[in-house]
């Protein structure tokens, strides 16, 4: 039993609220326990220079945190004049994850810009961002279909993500901040609804981990992501 009462294989309470931002083509507030992220999807009728004239689209992402999303204030990266390495890594991960499930040839020469803004951080902000951004992306693309700008939804399948780790020698799912800070191993899994992996990130913070521990974490992640797909599907069906 974990300190918050969850079992080793239990997600935190996950909620996804659609149409959270008035002006965005797609938007959600995604909550994994006390981690809260606003994800928006904006449609632009242009593509990066390397795609111009090729008749294909693009999906990319930006990620940021409010200065007081964490226990102590962090200066805005805009004030520093550059994007930090962690931020750059996370926003590239979000973009890759979403591009993995979009048929760019059906999107036409359009870009979908995903913005993930963490308003409260308690572990798992990148995995929550991916899971919520998928729903915002679906809403933005469905809007293009409804307006007749796309003939069909260019989504191949769903994508979601979750964290796992080894805490106190035990494999656990969906780590919060306290667990993440104490974890001997920290991993993130990104998967599609056809049970394929988009990305697996893992680091031993203390002792190296065994194949058996890796298998235990993978099993927890696969089961947890299946639950996230069900949540996404239920939210999109409303």
UniProtKB/Swiss-Prot annotation:
Keywords: Nucleotidyltransferase, RNA-binding, rRNA processing, Transferase, tRNA processing, tRNA-binding
UniProt cross-references to Gene3D superfamilies, sorted A to Z: GHMP Kinase, N-terminal domain (3.30.230.70)
InterPro entries with a match to the protein in the record: ExoRNase_PH_dom1 (IPR001247), ExoRNase_PH_dom2 (IPR015847), ExoRNase_PH_dom2_sf (IPR036345), PNPase/RNase_PH_dom_sf (IPR027408), Ribosomal_Su5_D2-typ_SF (IPR020568), RNase_PH (IPR050080), RNase_PH_bac-type (IPR002381), RNase_PH_CS (IPR018336)
EC number: 2.7.7.56
Annotated catalysed reactions: tRNA(n+1) + phosphate = tRNA(n) + a ribonucleoside 5'-diphosphate
Residues engaged in binding phosphate: 86, 124-126
Biological process per Gene Ontology, one example term: rRNA processing
Example GO molecular function: tRNA binding
HAMAP family in the record: RNase_PH (MF_00564)
Function in brief: Phosphorolytic 3'-5' exoribonuclease that plays an important role in tRNA 3'-end maturation. Removes nucleotide residues following the 3'-CCA terminus of tRNAs; can also add nucleotides to the ends of RNA molecules by using nucleoside diphosphates as substrates, but this may not be physiologically important. Probably plays a role in initiation of 16S rRNA degradation (leading to ribosome degradation) during starvation.
Quaternary structure (record): Homohexameric ring arranged as a trimer of dimers.
Family named by the database record: Belongs to the RNase PH family.
Record-given protein name: Ribonuclease PH
């Amino acid at each position: 039993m974990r300190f918050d009462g969850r079992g080793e294989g239990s997600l935190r309470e996950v909620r996804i609220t659609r149409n959270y931002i008035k002006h965005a083509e797609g938007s959600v507030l995604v909550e994994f326990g006390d981690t809260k992220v606003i994800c928006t999807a904006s449609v632009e009728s242009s593509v990066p220079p390397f795609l111009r004239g090729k008749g294909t689209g693009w999906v990319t992402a930006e990620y940021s945190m409010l200065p007081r999303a964490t226990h102590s204030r962090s200066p805005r990266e805009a004030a520093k004049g550059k994007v930090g390495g962690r931020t750059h890594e996370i926003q590239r991960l979000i973009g890759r994850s979403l591009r993995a499930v979009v048929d760019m040839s059906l999107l036409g020469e359009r870009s979908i810009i995903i913005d993930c803004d963490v308003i409260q951080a308690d572990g798992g902000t990148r995995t929550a961002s991916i899971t919520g951004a998928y729903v915002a992306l679906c809403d933005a693309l469905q809007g293009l279909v409804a307006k007749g700008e796309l003939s069909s939804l260019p989504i191949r399948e769903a994508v979601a993500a979750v964290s796992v780790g080894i805490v106190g020698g035990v494999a656990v799912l969906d780590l919060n901040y306290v667990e993440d800070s104490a974890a001997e191993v920290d991993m993130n899994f990104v998967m599609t609804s056809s049970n394929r992996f988009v990305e697996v990130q893992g680091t031993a913070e203390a002792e190296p981990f065994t194949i058996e521990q890796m298998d235990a974490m993978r099993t927890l992640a696969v089961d947890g992501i299946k639950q996230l797909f069900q949540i996404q599907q239920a939210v999109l069906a409303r």
